[in-house]
Amino acid sequence: RTDCYGNVNRIDTTGASCKTAKPEGLSYCGVPASKTIAERDLKAMDRYKTIIKKVGEKLCVEPAVIAGIISRESHAGKVLKNGWGDRGNGFGLMQVDKRSHKPQGTWNGEVHITQGTTILTDFIKRIQKKFPSWTKDQQLKGGISAYNAGAGNVRSYARMDIGTTHDDYANDVVARAQYYKQHGY
């Protein structure tokens, strides 16, 4: 099972903001921009597909969601230096922040992806407690937003991404995840 926390295909999304799309050299924004970026990362992502699917099964999270986060955080590792990014604070494909967590495993291995995905599920559970009336799919989106900016930043469904990087984190990740789901994740 990989659907314990909802289904990414049922989540509404506005996709990448222009602040996210422009540095990627795109003249357009929104879901089409997210899909283009996800597509550019697909070849690199496919190197980790087996591990991503294994961790998704183990933790009951859609592998496509894990892939969406990996694309957004590190372009499937393409922007990392010796496994580090974000000015030396973020570790690995999922950019686990060493200021909040002790990074585990190698930057691109199963232990790391398990740690990052566990951090995600912890945030989803916090959002479930904070917003019990939201649907599972809404709580999943809230958890994705919290993965970037913390559970305290999620104040309402409509505005959950305000305060995330480029104010579009969950919307962009969800759109990328929908792309990866169409490509066997």
Curated annotation (Swiss-Prot):
Pfam families xref list: SLT
Q: Which GO terms describe its biological process?
A: defense response to Gram-positive bacterium; killing of cells of another organism; peptidoglycan catabolic process
Catalyzed chemical reaction(s)? Hydrolysis of (1->4)-beta-linkages between N-acetylmuramic acid and N-acetyl-D-glucosamine residues in a peptidoglycan and between N-acetyl-D-glucosamine residues in chitodextrins
The question of whether Secreted is a record keyword is answered with yes
Spell out the molecular function terms from Gene Ontology: lysozyme activity
| Main localization of the protein described in the UniProt heading | secreted
Gene3D superfamilies in UniProt: 1.10.530.10
InterPro entries in the record: Glyco_hydro_23 (IPR002152), Lysozyme-like_dom_sf (IPR023346), Transglycosylase_SLT_dom_1 (IPR008258)
Q: Which residues cross the membrane?
A: none
GO CC aspect terms: extracellular region
The EC class name is: hydrolase
Query: Which compartment or compartments is the protein found in?
Result: Secreted
For whether the record's keyword set contains rRNA processing, the answer is no
Active site residues of this protein = 73
Provide the disulphide bond pattern: 4-60, 18-29
Its Enzyme Commission number(s) read 3.2.1.17
Miscellaneous remark of the record: Shows preference for N-acetylmuramic acid residues that are substituted with a peptide moiety. It acts only as a glycanohydrolase.
Q: Which family does it belong to?
A: Belongs to the glycosyl hydrolase 23 family.
Q: Which PANTHER family match?
A: LYSOZYME G FAMILY MEMBER, LYSOZYME G-RELATED
Q: What is this protein called?
A: Lysozyme g
Species this protein is from: Cygnus atratus (Black swan)
